[in-house]
Curated annotation (Swiss-Prot):
SUPFAM superfamilies: Nucleoside phosphorylase/phosphoribosyltransferase catalytic domain (SSF52418), Nucleoside phosphorylase/phosphoribosyltransferase N-terminal domain (SSF47648). It is an enzyme of class 2 (transferase). It comes from Nitrosospira multiformis (strain ATCC 25196 / NCIMB 11849 / C 71). GO terms for cellular component: cytosol. Pathway: Amino-acid biosynthesis; L-tryptophan biosynthesis; L-tryptophan from chorismate: step 2/5. The keyword Amino-acid biosynthesis applies. The keyword Cytoplasm does not apply. This is Anthranilate phosphoribosyltransferase. NCBIfam families: trpD (TIGR01245). Keywords: Amino-acid biosynthesis, Aromatic amino acid biosynthesis, Glycosyltransferase, Magnesium, Metal-binding, Transferase, Tryptophan biosynthesis. Catalyzes the transfer of the phosphoribosyl group of 5-phosphorylribose-1-pyrophosphate (PRPP) to anthranilate to yield N-(5'-phosphoribosyl)-anthranilate (PRA).
Length: 350
C-alpha cells in the first residue's frame, strides 16, 4: 500500500488492514517516507482512532527493528505508560520499578525523555545518576544481577529517528505514544501499562493478547474534570483491562479498596525533573503521603503481574514491605553504582 492510498483511507475513516499496516510501518522505519507524509498518517490514525489490528501490526514492525536485550526469566516485567496524559505527575512508574525489583520482580524498564510531559523516565534516572548509555548486554546483566535495567528507547529503536522530529514537532499524543510501551526490547511478557485515554484500555489489552503477552494490566486512572492518568490513580477510580491465562477481564479499582484515602491530583504533580527526582527519593525513604500511596498501588500491580504475588492486594503489601525495609532505596543505589561501574569497565560482561 502506498502512503497516499493509506492517507485516503484514513480520511474516509476506514481501517488499514494488517498486511497493509505492516508495509506502511516498514516504510516509516526504513526512512522511505517524508516527514510530511508521516505527520499526515499518524494524525489521520489519531483522528480516525487506531484499531487493535493497526496497533498490533505497527508494534510487530517496531519489534522487528528493535535491538534485542536477551533475558530469560518468568518474572520479567515492564512498567510504563503511553505518556500524553498532560497530568504533569512525578515519575510514578519509574519509582514503582525500584519497589517491584526490591520485591523480587525482574524489571526491564523501557522509556525515553519527555515528549509531552514535564519529565520522562530517562530524564529523572539521569538526574539520579544512572548511566543511560548502556549496551544490550550490560542491561541484561543489570537485570540478572540487581533485578532492574533501564533501556533508553532511542538506543534500541534507532529506526524511530525517522519519526522523532515529527513526533516532537507535533507535541501531541499519537500512535507512537501507544507503540512505545508495546515494544520492550527485552520482550517482557508481563506488564503494567498505563494509557492516556479510557477507550484504549480494552484496545491495548487486546493488542497485547494478540502479541502473545502472558499477564498484563492495562490501566487508566480517572480524575474527573482534570482528565486522566496513564497510571493507577489515587484521585478516583482506575479502569483496568487484565489479561491472564489467555482471558481478558475488565473492571475498576479505587484506592479505598486497599485501605488508602483518595487524594487530589495536585498532590502527585511535579513541576520539573528535579522535583520529580526529589519525590522519588522521598518515597524510597518511606515518606508517607499520596505520592507513596500511588507508588504502592502501581508497584503492587507490577509485582502481581510479574508473578510475585497472588493478587493485587498482596502485591501492594509486598511493595510496602520493600519500601519499609529499605530494599527499594538500595535498588536505586545499586543501579546507579552498577551502571556506572560498567561504563568504567569495572564489571565483566557475559
Amino acid at each position: 500500500m502506498s502512503p497516499q492510498e493509506a492517507l485516503t483511507r484514513l480520511i474516509e475513516h476506514r481501517e488499514i488492514f494488517h498486511d497493509e499496516m505492516l508495509s506502511l510501518m516498514r516504510q516509516i522505519m526504513r526512512g522511505e517516507l517524508s516527514p510530511t507524509l508521516i505527520s499526515a498518517i499518524i494524525t489521520g490514525l489519531r483522528v480516525k482512532k487506531e484499531t487493535v489490528g493497526e496497533i498490533a501490526a505497527a508494534a510487530q514492525v517496531m519489534r522487528e527493528f528493535a535491538a534485542p536485550v536477551q533475558v530469560e526469566d518468568d518474572r520479567l516485567v515492564d512498567t510504563c505508560g503511553t505518556g500524553g496524559d498532560s497530568a504533569h505527575t512525578f515519575n510514578i512508574s519509574t519509582t514503582a520499578a525500584f519497589v517491584a525489583a526490591a520485591a523480587g520482580a525482574r524489571v526491564a524498564k523501557h522509556g525515553g525523555r519527555s515528549v509531552s510531559s514535564k519529565s520522562g523516565s530517562a530524564d529523572v534516572l539521569e538526574a539520579l545518576g544512572v548511566n543511560l548509555d548502556q549496551t544490550p548486554a550490560q542491561i541484561a546483566e543489570n537485570i540478572r544481577e540487581i533485578g532492574l535495567g533501564f533501556m533508553f528507547a532511542p538506543n534500541f529503536h534507532s529506526a524511530m529517528k525517522h519519526a522523532a522530529s515529527v513526533r516532537r514537532e507535533l507535541g501531541v499524543r499519537t500512535l507512537f505514544n501507544i507503540l512505545g510501551p508495546l515494544t520492550n526490547p527485552a520482550g517482557a511478557k508481563n506488564q503494567l501499562l498505563g494509557v492516556f485515554h479510557p477507550d484504549l484500555v480494552g484496545i491495548v489489552t487486546r493488542v497485547l493478547h494478540r502479541l502473545g503477552s502472558r499477564h498484563v494490566m492495562v490501566v487508566h486512572g480517572c480524575t474527573g474534570n482534570q482528565g486522566g492518568l496513564d497510571e493507577i490513580t489515587i484521585a478516583g477510580e482506575t479502569l483496568v483491562g487484565e489479561l491472564r491465562h489467555g482471558q481478558i477481564l475488565e473492571y475498576t479499582i479505587r484506592p479505598e479498596d486497599f485501605g488508602m484515602k483518595a487524594a487530589r491530583i495536585e498532590t502527585i504533580q511535579a513541576h520539573d525533573t528535579a522535583q520529580s527526582a526529589e519525590m522519588l527519593r522521598a518515597i524510597l525513604n518511606n515518606q508517607p503521603g499520596p505520592p507513596r500511596d500511588i507508588v504502592l498501588l502501581n508497584a503492587g500491580a507490577t509485582i502481581y503481574v510479574a508473578g510475585i504475588a497472588e493478587s493485587l492486594a498482596q502485591g501492594v503489601k509486598k511493595a510496602h514491605a520493600a519500601i519499609e525495609s529499605g530494599a527499594a532505596r538500595k535498588k536505586l543505589q545499586e543501579l546507579v553504582e552498577f551502571s556506572n561501574r560498567q561504563n568504567r569497565g569495572e564489571v565483566s560482561l557475559v
